[in-house]
Amino acid sequence: MFSAAPAEADGPGVGAPYVVTLGDSAISGEAGRWAGNTNQSSSKTDALGSTAYYDNAANTAETISGCHRSKAAEAHIGNGVMSANLACSGARTYTQTPGSGDFKPGLDFYSDANGRKGQALALQEFAATHNVKAVTVLIGANNFGFADIVQTCITNFLLSPSWWPNYCNDDSNVQAYFTTAAVNTQTTNVKNALLNVRQAMLNAGYADSSYKIIVQTYSSPIPNSSGFRYSQSGYTRQNTGGCGFWNADANWANSTAVVKINQAVTNGAAQTGLTNIRYLYATNALNGRRLCENTVGLLEEKGVATWQSTGAADKTEWVSQVRTLTTVFGPYQIQESLHPNYWGQKALRNCLRMAYNNGNPITGTCTRGTGLNAYGEPNMSFA
């Protein structure tokens, strides 16, 4: 009498292939609920509805409050590839356990009696029972105080007149994040986070040659000064557009802040010495569709009825408006401010699918196209 050999359990090299994403809000899916921006009814841009960030099995809640792992997140490339989004909005390279507020798992092996785990430990446990072919990482911006910087810039814009602007780029608390010593510290933090990813995979039974780490860079969210469709004089830049940055601060954001954060990411990756790293360069991926850019507009400015209208993705913004305590209302949340929205995330998902390259990940730069592909994502190129 013959019996079939027992089926091998899924794990390293066995079972359906998986892509796992680790990092912060820029990859977890923050703002993924919204497709474009409007100052009219929020229903016009509400692509995913009130359950947008629910990621538990029953679709009834978040597994970790505030992580905002949206259903539009780039992890979910499909095409026969399974996905797990372990990233968390607000995450730094290291785990944060505030006395009040939400738990923020970093790219470490944190574990506590409440069952809370760092993202590296979560990856290790997941990878042991799933066939992970690529781990995509986007981390570092919160180490540089991203949210604090944005708040400082917007506050300075709103509280100073155009004839005597108070810039954020020369504020001591902002400059402190970008000193040579500070950048070197964050570069080391990124390096160690990526080495934790490698250690997690090693602990789960993976040789370096059996998977790739795809290191992603941050996308510029706003244009340079010449690309804004609202003047910096008056208040329309913030009150209408939700992009209250002085021209000089917008230029600094692109020439200095985004550059130095991304240098910490790529230099940190290089310093690991790992040979299984690939790069997804996304710095300019949203160009032409950024917040308040003069090539796009609010839905009502472009005559677009809803996010589902033909051509909406080419006419409206791929980055969410900055909302403040006085302008946040209804279903919007302050933490969604200045993140790639539904369209931005779908565009980056397209990029990640191309970087994944059918299981043989490659390095490349992602560039925006026009129109939508068969998955309903903005067309992008990767080379």
Predicted regions mapped to residue ranges:
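C-terminal accessory extensions appended to soluble enzyme cores
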Residues: Y356-A383
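Catalytic nucleophile-elbow at a beta strand-turn-alpha helix junction centered on a G-D-S/GDSL motif
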Residues: P17-W34, T45, F144, Y342
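Conserved SGNH/GDSL esterase-like catalytic core that processes O-acyl groups on lipids
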Residues: S42-A181
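Mobile gating loops/cap/lid regions near enzyme active sites that modulate substrate access
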Residues: S220-H339
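A structural motif corresponding to the C-terminal end of an alpha-helix
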Residues: E74-S83, Q186-I213, D249-Y281
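Secretory targeting and sorting signals
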Residues: M1-A9
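Short, solvent-exposed loop/turn and secondary-structure capping segments
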Residues: P12-G13, G29-A35, T95-G99, F146-Q151, ...
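Solvent-exposed loop/turn segments at secondary-structure junctions
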Residues: S25-G29, C88-Y94, A141-F146, S219-P223, ...
